[in-house]
Structures are given as structure tokens and as C-alpha cells.
Amino acid sequence: PIETLLQQLVARSGDVAGAQPVLTQMRGAISNMQSKVNAAQSSINGMYNSLQNEVNQFASSLGEIEWTLGQLAEASFQLLPSEGAIQAVKAVWVQGQKETDQDPAGVLYLTDQRLVFEQKQDIATKRVLFVVTEKKKVQELKLELPITQVESVKASKRGLLGHEDHLEFSFGSGASVPLGHFHIDGQDCNRWQALVGRARSGDFDQERAVAVDQAQVEKARAAPVQCPNCGGQLPPVLRGMDTIKCEFCGKVVRL
């Protein structure tokens, strides 16, 4: 122990030659103790950094949840009775090969049953000398698809230094559009790709705080696929729906 070596060193304070070996031992003991202190400090810092990262991640997730709920409260559509929101993000629906100012901007929503894009932006209606003097707010549903019609989704990093997050969807037959390219803002595209995959496989049904109503599941499964009025194919029926409207003749079919 350092205390013992220190006592020996004090006892040999008048004997330089005899004190030298003790001094060497003491230096080694101090160096060893310093190494242990540094290791303990690194371990504590690591624990703190890990905890801080978890706190930051939790705060970020909480912020996303609050923002999603706020957007849903303002949305032009409503969730179905047994539908759960998973994620929402600011997005631009890229209509061509490259993104332009004419592409609709708004919010991309992912639920356990649907993929929804709502345009939500201020559009210039009047300019004076290239300066916008009047705007109008546009908010309307542009895309609404059952998650089962999502065949695939590709995530990609683009732009300078790969700081832009993009999602490219491929939709199945019966969808209103075959493809959908979205530039999302502020969230990771790879994370979104994983969330969409989980929604498609039904993983989120296992994590619900309130179990899925099996009666609603059976009602959706037993729903007609053809319109009883014109014989046209009806849109997919989602859990929680009470009626479905034929896109051909306009008849509302009660489930």
C-alpha cells in the first residue's frame, strides 16, 4: 500500500541510498493507482454517455410522437376506429425525375393499416417583381393506400454528402398510382423503410396497448370484393370500416 511505502520513505529520509528503492516502489504504486483511477473514470464516463444517449433518443422519440399527434389533429382525414398511427414526417412527393418547387409538400403518414400523404403547404398566388405578396393554404389528401398494397420500399441517401433522405415505393395492382417517390425531412429513410416493413408484416399488432378487435378483423375478411350494384371490384376493406364506396357506380356498401 502507498501508505506503508510512505512511512518507510519518511523513516529513511536521512538515508538517500536506502530511500531510493522505496521511492521507486512508490512511483510504481502511484502509477498503478493512476491507471485504475483513469479506468474507473472512463467507465463512469461511458456509463454517463450511454445514459445521455438513451435520454436524447427518448426525448427525440417523444418529440416525434407529439408532432405526429399534432399533425393528426389538424389532418383532413381521420384514423379508423381500430387504426394506430406509427409515424409521420414532413415530405415532398417528387413527381418527376428531379424534385421541383411544383411538387406537393406536406406530411407522409404511416399507420398500421395505411400509407397516407397529405399536401399541406402555403402556395404563392400573387407576385410583384418576383416577391410573393399573396398566398393560399392548400391542405388535401393526395395519396391513401392500404399498407397491403405496398409491394416494396427503397431507402436512399442523396444530395450533397448524402444528407437527403428519400423513399421510393412500389405499389401493387389496384393502387391509384404505381410508384411514389418521397423526399422526407428530418428523419432517417432507413428507419422508415424498417417501419414500413414491420407494418406490412403486421408486427405492430403485437405491440398494441389495446388488443385488436377480432370482430373487426373478421368483418374486414368477410367483406365483399365486388359491388352488388354494378359488379365492379370494390376497394380493399380495412379493419374498422363500416362502409365502402364503389369507385365505379358510387354505391355505398354497408359492411
Predicted features along the sequence, with ranges:
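Short linker/helix segments within small regulatory modules
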Residues: P236-K245
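Cys/His-rich microdomains that often coordinate metals
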Residues: L234, V252-L255
